[in-house]
């Protein structure tokens, strides 16, 4: 009996539709040359379908296109559904949104279509820093770099190969990645970087205690102690990352129709989501051209939102004439 089957059995045991959802997933840990290209792969399905495959590993390939091919094979074989969520573009040394494929060839329409299909979300913040933007990319934004930059801008995930440089940042941070996506859409006809945003923890101790006063660290050697703040995490380029550089963050929030695997996955697929640094905020907005002030006071705010426009994560088309 494989560890994977034990894992899916655990998720199945604790999954209680309508009350507590335990989704099946795993982390694909591609890190070529120390550059973070990790993806979290989430199943819409249960053990019956997930057990028909064994997770595709970065030991088999570090090329995201190989992962997408495996995901396509899974869906064809089982009738199930998958999506992948990249994280920590801030530690990719410019590779998260690079304008070439893994082998260095220019992006094609086929590549853009496949990436847009499989990777509809990106993680904006987590324990290993903030991937939204950098002060050098947004010099007029007083909040750029307000948190989650210190220690993480030294270099890539493993502090190998070469230090981070300003030239890398337009293809590693999310705001800049969205702009690159629009540029590619104009060129290719498809936007490869059209994604919604979620938060996450990336802690490996199975705890979601992410409040600053209840933070249990990423690994067991970072759990609470008087001296954990100066625990050495990584060293390279004459720099040191310490535990104090890690963030107590973050959360993924999902506007699902019900508390089930299927509904939560579907909401993620349509990008009706948002991320926070850990605060449990309720955020919901819609976009459209037919809303009236009275809609804000409606007892069914969401109904008006869906009827007259599109939800967060949706496509807002060009305004009609006169609006």
Residue ranges with predicted function:
Residues 1-100:
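A metal-dependent hydrolase metal-coordination microenvironment
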Residues 8-11, 30-33, 75-82, 88-323:
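C-terminal functional module detector
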């Amino acid at each position: 009996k494989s560890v994977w089957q034990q894992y899916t059995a655990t998720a199945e045991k604790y999954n209680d539709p309508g009350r507590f959802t335990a989704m099946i997933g795993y982390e694909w840990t591609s890190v070529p040359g120390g550059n973070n290209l990790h993806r979290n792969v989430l199943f819409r399905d249960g053990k019956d379908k997930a057990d028909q495959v064994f997770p595709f590993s970065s030991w088999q390939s570090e090329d995201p296109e190989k992962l997408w091919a495996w995901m396509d094979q899974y869906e064809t074989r089982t009738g199930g559904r998958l999506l992948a969520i990249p994280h920590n573009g801030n530690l990719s040394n410019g590779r998260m949104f690079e304008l070439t494929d893994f082998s260095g060839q220019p992006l094609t329409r086929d590549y853009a279509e496949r990436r847009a299909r499989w990777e509809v979300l990106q993680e904006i913040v987590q324990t290993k820093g903030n991937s939204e933007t950098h002060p050098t990319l947004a010099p007029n934004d007083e909040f750029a770099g307000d948190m989650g930059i210190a220690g993480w801008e030294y270099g890539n995930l493993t502090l190998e190969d070469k230090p981070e440089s300003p030239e890398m940042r337009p293809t590693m941070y999310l705001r800049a990645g969205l702009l690159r996506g629009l540029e590619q859409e104009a060129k290719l006809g498809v936007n490869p970087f059209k994604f919604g945003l979620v938060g996450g923890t990336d802690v490996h101790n199975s705890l979601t205690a992410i409040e600053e006063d209840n933070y249990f660290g990423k690994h067991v050697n970072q759990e609470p102690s008087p001296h954990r703040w100066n625990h050495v995490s990584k060293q390279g380029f004459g720099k040191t990352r310490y535990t104090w550089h890690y963030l107590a963050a973050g959360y993924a929030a999902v506007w699902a129709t019900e508390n089930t695997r299927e509904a939560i996955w579907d909401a993620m697929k349509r990008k009706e989501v948002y991320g926070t640094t850990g605060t449990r905020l309720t955020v919901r907005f819609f976009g459209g051209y037919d809303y009236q002030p009275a809609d804000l006071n409606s007892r069914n705010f969401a109904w008006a939102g869906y009827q007259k426009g599109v939800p967060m994560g949706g496509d807002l088309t060009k305004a009609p004439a006169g609006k």
